[in-house]
Every structure is written in C-alpha cells, then in structure tokens.
Amino acid sequence: MKGGKSKAKSDNKLAVKKQAADTKKTKKAVKDPNKPKRPPSAFFVFMEDFRKTYKEKHPNNKSVAVVGKAGGDKWKQLTAAEKAPFISKAEKRKQEYEKNLQAYNKKQAAGAAEEEESDKSRSEVNDDDEDQDGSGEDDSEDDD
C-alpha cells in the first residue's frame, strides 16, 4: 500500500494544528464592560466633525472607505493651527479618561480584596465537603 505512512503523519500533524488552533481561541480574555473606553486621538475627534459635513455634502455616498480616505487627506492638509482645536479636545478627553480609569482601578482593587476575603471564608466552610460528590458512593475504584 503506497503512501500509508505519509498519510498517517499528515493526519497526525493536522490534528495537532487543529488542537493548537482550538486552544488559541479559548485563551482570549473577556473584556470588562465597565472599564472606561480609551479616548479618541485628535484625528478621530476631527473625523467626528468631518463625517457630519461630508454626509451633508455627499448624501448619496454609503462607502465608509471613501469618507475615511477623504478625511485622511483633509487632515494631512490641515496646518498645526487648524489642528489645534482638535488636539485640545483630545487632550481634555484623555485627562477625563485617566480620571475615570483611576476610579475604575480603585473600584477593581477594592472588589478584588472583598472577593479574596469571601473566597477565604467560603473555603473554610467547604473544606469538609470537597471530597463528597453527593452520590453517597466512595470515589475510590475497586477492581473486582
């Protein structure tokens, strides 16, 4: 039988790759919905205004890419003085974000300390019950 060994090797390699891909998917961290969002940069503050004016001038345009391209070109053409109001708005939002983030981190630290204490008290209560599964049977296996 030709190719039997190579097919087995390739099937084995494929199985290993699938397992690796499956483990990568499960490792993704869950985002906390209460965490404050990062503030927009000066360019994105500019784009908020630019999108409104662009839609007024071009109401039939549905392409996001075209709006983004036009906004990027316009941003590049602006002088530093014209960019200044957007930069200052971005700085204000950044300062507000930093305050919110500090408050969030304090709240998380306080919550973690409370959770740790509750885990300690819970473990003291449940120490006796850890070996019991509620079935009334002994967990050890007998080979009769």
Curated annotation (Swiss-Prot):
Subcellular location: Nucleus
CC terms in the record's Gene Ontology section: chromatin; nucleus
GO biological process: chromatin organization
Bias (Acidic residues) ranges: 126-144
InterPro entries named among the record's database cross-references: HMG_box_dom (IPR009071), HMG_box_dom_sf (IPR036910), HMGB_plant (IPR031061)
Superkingdom per UniProt: Eukaryota
Basic and acidic residues composition-biased segments: 8-35, 89-99
Keyword DNA-binding listed: yes
DNA-binding region: 36-105
Tissues expressing this chain: Expressed at higher levels in dark-grown tissues, such as roots; and at lower levels in light-grown tissues, such as cotyledons and stems.
Main localization category: nucleus
Region (Disordered): 1-42, 85-144
Induction: Regulated by darkness and by a circadian rhythm.
GO molecular function annotation: chromatin binding; DNA binding; structural constituent of chromatin
Keywords from the UniProt entry: DNA-binding, Nucleus
Listed transmembrane segments: none
PROSITE patterns xref list: HMG_BOX_2
Protein family per UniProt: Belongs to the HMGB family.
UniProt-recorded name of the protein: HMG1/2-like protein
